[in-house]
A protein has these predicted regions:
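Phosphate-binding site recognition
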Residues: 1-165
Length: 165
């Protein structure tokens, strides 16, 4: 069982890493305007590995809202995290970020039962942005638990005009 202190340490290092990213040279993607951060539905960005899901989400969040909470579940330090520890994670997020309205959950499909956690956060009026791979997020579980509560955005590798642009 992970403690708030352990999670706070992990989340703090993830936040520092994220804030160090320089997104000024990144290419704008056609999908950026589709991500509706003010929606009551979770914004779920799905795509193949290394297609830029995390980058596009970070870019949109920085440009449109500025301050947001962030968790990267594709982190070996969080691999043992269980569903019943998500409340502890949430407590650590509040301690680190204060009272946030936007939450970026990167690769959350690595946690079993994450959908019910996201549903609860949506009911609490937190705007959720999720990234994940096609194989896991396109499962029937996503469609069952988040039906009517998510906007799926498919992110493909660069188009020719984006690549040349």
């Amino acid at each position: 069982m992970m403690t708030v202190r352990q999670l706070l340490s992990i989340l703090s290092s993830q936040k520092e890493e994220l804030e160090a990213n320089d997104l000024t040279s990144f290419v704008s993607r056609y999908e950026e305007p589709i991500i509706n951060l003010d929606s009551k539905m979770a914004q779920v960005v799905i795509g193949v590995r290394r297609s830029g899901k995390s980058t596009i989400c970070e870019k949109v969040l920085r440009e449109k809202v500025g301050d947001f909470a962030y968790v990267n579940f594709d982190d070996e330090r969080l691999v043992s995290l269980k569903t019943d520890e998500l409340d502890t994670l949430l407590e650590a997020l509040y301690r680190l970020n204060g009272d946030f309205k936007y939450l970026f959950l990167d690769e959350i499909q690595n946690i079993d039962g994450w959908q019910l956690f996201v549903n609860r956060l949506l009911r609490q009026k937190i705007h959720i942005l999720i990234t994940g791979s096609n194989s896991k997020l396109l499962s029937s579980e996503l469609m069952t638990h988040l039906t009517g509560r998510h906007n799926r955005i498919n992110l493909y590798p660069f188009s020719l005009s984006e690549y040349c642009g």
